[in-house]
């Protein structure tokens, strides 16, 4: 089958042929990929930052990335009875076992036997991808794979972060969202759908801030290199600071901004990564009793919830579409900060 292949770290992806996936387990599902989201994690993979993950998984280069997939079922294992060939589906990023303590507790994203297509197994930047039946969510009627694919990781990650914030993001509070890009634009909408907190969005892109207002933000602030935006945000909170910060950036200074924006007993939900905090930052969080909460991709159940929000029109994805052969254009567009919403590759069409 045709695929976009990572053959060398920090070099362009190459279009070529790789083996088709095959059914090896009773619950396996093979999907013809109609859309695959392009994620910043794919850039980290491209840079070689997941080389140790690959080594532990017993794989290496060449490798097929892509962990946000949607399309149509092409083949199912003999144990799959609730799905059929031709069904339009989106895929939770992880193929999980269902039996380990994490799965039984409903925390399937922490499955001890997980398979992660696109990160630790061949992914969706190809005509076909293999997962298992536990990862499959039907696409609602009227929704396309292009619309569905970014929900599977970008959407699900943003949604889980929002759910973690809800206990504190009650009416009369301030929630600051750092970043209105691929994850942030989904998080803003999910937060607006589920909460009446005052939403303040910070981003370096003026166009993204304009769109943030249409997504449900109450106030927007342009991030500046002199960091004057921190004082501006605190002024919008009448000096109290944020009850919650949702940091969808996690680098480039945003990780420091998040700490300085927190009010007393504030919570920093950390989603983006790549930055560093100095040890003396602890003195800024001790007295106000600030808390830090890590947040990763959500559960299967949360993906079903998010799809329901999208079906009702409460969450609408902004996407920029590329053919599979345009993968290097997609990578550079994201890397250079020019991506509008979420980049989506289209390996095959209906």
What is each stretch, according to the model?
Residues 166-173, 209-291:
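Glycine-rich cofactor phosphate-binding loops and adjacent beta1-alpha1 units
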Residues 37, 77, 94, 249-250, ...:
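Short glycine-/small-residue-rich Rossmann-like dinucleotide-binding loops
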Residues 41-46:
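Cytochrome P450 core scaffold surrounding the K-helix E-X-X-R motif
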Residues 141-226, 231-232:
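Mid-domain Rossmann-like dinucleotide-binding core that forms the NAD(H)/NADP(H) cofactor-binding site
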Residues 58-62, 67, 97-178, 209:
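NAD(P)H dinucleotide-binding glycine-rich loop of Rossmann-like/cofactor-binding domains
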Residues 205, 274, 298:
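Residues in the short beta-alpha loop(s) of Rossmann-like NAD(P)-binding domains
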């Amino acid at each position: 089958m045709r695929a976009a292949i990572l053959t060398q770290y920090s070099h362009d992806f190459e279009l070529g042929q790789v083996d088709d996936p095959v059914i090896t387990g009773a619950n396996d599902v093979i999907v013809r990929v109609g859309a695959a989201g392009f994620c910043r994690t794919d850039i980290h993979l491209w840079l070689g930052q997941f080389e140790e993950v690959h080594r532990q998984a017993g794989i290496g280069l060449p490798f097929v990335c892509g962990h946000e997939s949607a399309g149509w079922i092409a083949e199912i294992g003999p144990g799959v009875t609730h799905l059929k060939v031709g069904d339009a589906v989106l895929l939770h990023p992880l193929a999980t076992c269902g039996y380990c303590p994490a799965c039984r507790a409903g925390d399937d994203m922490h499955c001890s036997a997980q398979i992660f297509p696109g990160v630790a197994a061949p992914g969706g930047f190809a005509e076909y991808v293999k997962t298992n039946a536990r990862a499959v969510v039907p696409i609602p009627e009227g929704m396309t794979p292009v619309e569905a694919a970014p929900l599977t990781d970008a959407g699900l990650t943003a949604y889980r972060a929002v759910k973690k914030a809800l206990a504190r993001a009650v009416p009369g509070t301030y929630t600051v969202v750092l970043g209105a890009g691929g994850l942030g634009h989904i998080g803003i909408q999910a937060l607006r759908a589920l909460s009446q907190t005052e939403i303040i969005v910070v981003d370096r892109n003026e166009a993204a801030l304009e769109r943030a207002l249409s997504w449900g933000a109450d106030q927007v602030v342009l991030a500046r290199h002199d960091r004057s935006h921190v004082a501006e945000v605190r002024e919008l909170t009448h000096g109290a600071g944020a009850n919650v910060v949702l940091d969808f950036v996690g680098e480039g200074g945003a990780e420091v901004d998040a700490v300085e924006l927190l009010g007393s007993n504030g919570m920093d939900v950390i989603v983006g990564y790549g930055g560093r905090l100095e040890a003396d930052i602890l003195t800024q969080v001790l007295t106000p009793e600030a808390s830090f909460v890590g947040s990763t991709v959500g559960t299967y159940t949360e993906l079903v919830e998010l799809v329901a929000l999208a079906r009702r029109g409460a969450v609408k994805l902004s996407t920029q579409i590329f053919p599979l052969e345009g993968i290097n254009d997609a990578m550079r567009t994201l890397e250079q900060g020019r991506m509008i919403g979420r980049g989506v590759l289209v390996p095959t069409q209906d």
